[in-house]
């Protein structure tokens, strides 16, 4: 199967998981990116079962609304039973690198509220150690250079994310993103806490403190379900 076919496979598997485990009338947390889009497309077929969704980005909001799925602000919701999102990398403990699509801060906020985080990914995203995929850090623009120096001191190579025309990429929150290459993150929780403490960091794209509860992993043999132990 192609990577796109694997994404559609796990998108449908996530919709099936929601149908089986989330009661009718609930609100679903939805992530951002190409794999999350496959979940949205599958969810659209059963949208009448649920009140709607909480979105993690402007792009996701637009896709949900295009399917006629009502979008709630997180502040309107008392509880969120499930959050479904992709990952750029996921390790054996359920820690992830996320943020390739630029929505890491809102993704982390919505994930933190959800009872269950369901990661959906193709098999190439499973890694023994996080860091081959550049680690995104959303930063306040004036802190970009200072954060870059801190990253360099840890052995990373900071690269400012830019648009096709060479301008700094701007997040939905009005900030910039540094993508850090050359890392091997043996202690995701510790590294997440360390970077998040730097002045000027909005959030780092490490999801270790709030990692996945389970992963639906698309493989040539079908969908593999991996359950991670509670922290």
Swiss-Prot record:
Single GO cellular component term: cytosol
4Fe-4S found in the keyword field: no
Active site residues per record: 107
The keyword Transport appears for this protein: no
Pfam families, per database record: Rib_5-P_isom_A
GO molecular function, one term: ribose-5-phosphate isomerase activity
Binding site for substrate: 32-35, 85-88, 98-101, 125
Catalytic activity: aldehydo-D-ribose 5-phosphate = D-ribulose 5-phosphate
Known pathway: Carbohydrate degradation; pentose phosphate pathway; D-ribose 5-phosphate from D-ribulose 5-phosphate (non-oxidative stage): step 1/1
Signal peptide range in chain numbering: none
InterPro entries named among the record's database cross-references: NagB/RpiA_transferase-like, Ribose5P_isomerase_typA_subgr, Ribose5P_isomerase_type_A
Top-rank lineage group of the source organism: Bacteria
Disulfide bonds: none
GO BP field: D-ribose metabolic process; pentose-phosphate shunt, non-oxidative branch
EC numbers for this chain: 5.3.1.6
Keywords, in A-Z order: Isomerase
PANTHER family per UniProt: RIBOSE-5-PHOSPHATE ISOMERASE
Quaternary state and interactors: Homodimer.
Protein family according to the UniProt entry: Belongs to the ribose 5-phosphate isomerase family.
Its biological purpose: Catalyzes the reversible conversion of ribose-5-phosphate to ribulose 5-phosphate.
Record's protein name: Ribose-5-phosphate isomerase A
